[in-house]
């Protein structure tokens, strides 16, 4: 059996604008220029003002111009993206945090940083705060999200202070005249705003990316990776349906949801999730909570349970996934079950990063064991994959024969179902 692990690099390999910063740039562009008349996706992607801000979109447009210039942009969805992002403080925070020099933004790390600031603040506040502007980053975040305001008078020793807005103050218990910060309202407001960003991202991927993939797949120039031609199960961290529409409709598990359902934007477990110190105040922001609530990993766990029962092993191929420690629970599970492991990389820097990340997850000893016992091997995407594909095909044929035997047995089982 052959299993494929996918990350966003898979979409990038196919020149699709699925990075978070592509979404930010397009959403901001729609806000500023949509009324100029943008009938087709190509009218947006070809605009020099957008391309100057986002050179990768220019690259995608050059690759897929024929398709983009003929796919109609949904006015209703474009307007909804604009409405969801307008005045959304998470969206403006992400936009301001975008590193123009590096050309990327890590939503998860930014969310984790913001939540850490609010968690520290709310854990330590039992009365109405009057906070000196000491920690610049923390103060900026607390004020940016609209819960605080500067006072008109100076605080201690002439230092300006920041106070919470009355909207977020409650009397507790009722009638006691004891005023407290309404922690639940602050957390639910943060969660609601982030949910709107997730909705906007889903709409962007739906009407700018997903809708184009079937058309791109039919084009003779469409780029396809020979190494993943014989896959039985796919575990994807992507929101798009690129693999299904360009390669195979075999069983695929979208752990973070996809454009046809809810999508997950959140952070990983931390010390607040340990049983000794568990704090569920911010649990709705955690990916494991969202995967459970929206049931995006339900089918995946059923499949893993089946593997545990049958003791069936598999060849695992990873493509476009950073193998970062943020997804270590899934990575460890798949790597532990795999008989052989192949990691595809697009350049030497990526290979270095993959090796370093796996060492972080497994440690040196277990990393060496993976190389020694599970044939952990790294392959460049620029190589000839003919022999590699033949190897995977033989694994897939083994599964076929285990399930159905010879062709006659397969035909009988098929018609009897």
Model-derived features: positions:
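Extended, H/D-rich, highly charged conserved domains that either
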Residues: 40-295
């Amino acid at each position: 059996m052959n299993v494929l692990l996918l990350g966003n690099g898979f979409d990038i390999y196919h020149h699709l604008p699925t990075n978070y910063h592509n979404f930010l740039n397009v959403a901001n562009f729609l806000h500023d220029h949509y009324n100029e008349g943008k009938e087709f996706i190509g009218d947006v992607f070809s605009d020099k003002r957008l391309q100057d801000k986002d050179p990768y979109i220019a690259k995608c447009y050059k690759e897929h111009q024929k398709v983009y210039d003929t796919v109609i942009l949904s006015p209703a969805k474009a307007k909804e993206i604009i409405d969801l992002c307008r005045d959304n403080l998470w969206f403006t925070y992400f936009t301001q945090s975008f590193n123009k020099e590096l050309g990327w933004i890590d939503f998860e790390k930014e969310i984790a940083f913001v939540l850490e600031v609010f968690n520290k603040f709310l854990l330590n506040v039992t009365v109405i705060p009057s906070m000196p502007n000491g920690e610049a980053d923390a103060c900026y975040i607390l004020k940016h999200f609209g819960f605080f305001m500067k006072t008109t008078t100076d605080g201690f020793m002439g230092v300006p202070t920041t106070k919470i807005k009355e909207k977020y103050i409650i009397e507790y218990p009722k009638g006691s005249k004891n005023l407290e910060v309404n922690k639940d309202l602050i957390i639910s407001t943060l969660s609601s705003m982030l949910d709107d960003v997730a909705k906007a991202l889903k709409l962007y991927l739906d009407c700018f990316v997903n809708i184009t993939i079937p058309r791109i797949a039919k084009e003779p120039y469409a780029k396809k990776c020979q190494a993943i031609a014989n896959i039985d199960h796919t575990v994807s961290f992507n929101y798009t349906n690129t693999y299904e529409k360009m390669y195979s409709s075999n069983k695929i598990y979208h752990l973070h949801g996809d454009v046809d359902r809810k999508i997950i934007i959140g952070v990983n477990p931390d010390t607040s999730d340990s049983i000794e110190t568990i704090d569920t105040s911010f649990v709705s922001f955690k990916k494991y909570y969202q995967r459970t609530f929206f049931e995006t990993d339900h089918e995946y766990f059923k499949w893993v349970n089946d593997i545990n029962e049958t003791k069936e092993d598999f060849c695992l191929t990873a493509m476009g996934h950073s193998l970062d420690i943020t997804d270590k629970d899934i990575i460890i599970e798949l790597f532990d079950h795999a008989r052989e492991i192949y990691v595809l990389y697009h350049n030497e820097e990526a290979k270095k990063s993959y090796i370093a990340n796996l060492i972080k997850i497994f440690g040196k000893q277990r990393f060496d064991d993976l190389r020694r016992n599970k044939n952990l091997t790294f392959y460049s995407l620029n190589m000839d994959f003919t022999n590699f594909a033949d190897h995977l095909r033989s694994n897939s044929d083994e599964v076929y024969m285990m399930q159905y035997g010879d062709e006659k047995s397969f035909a009988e089982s098929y018609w009897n179902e």
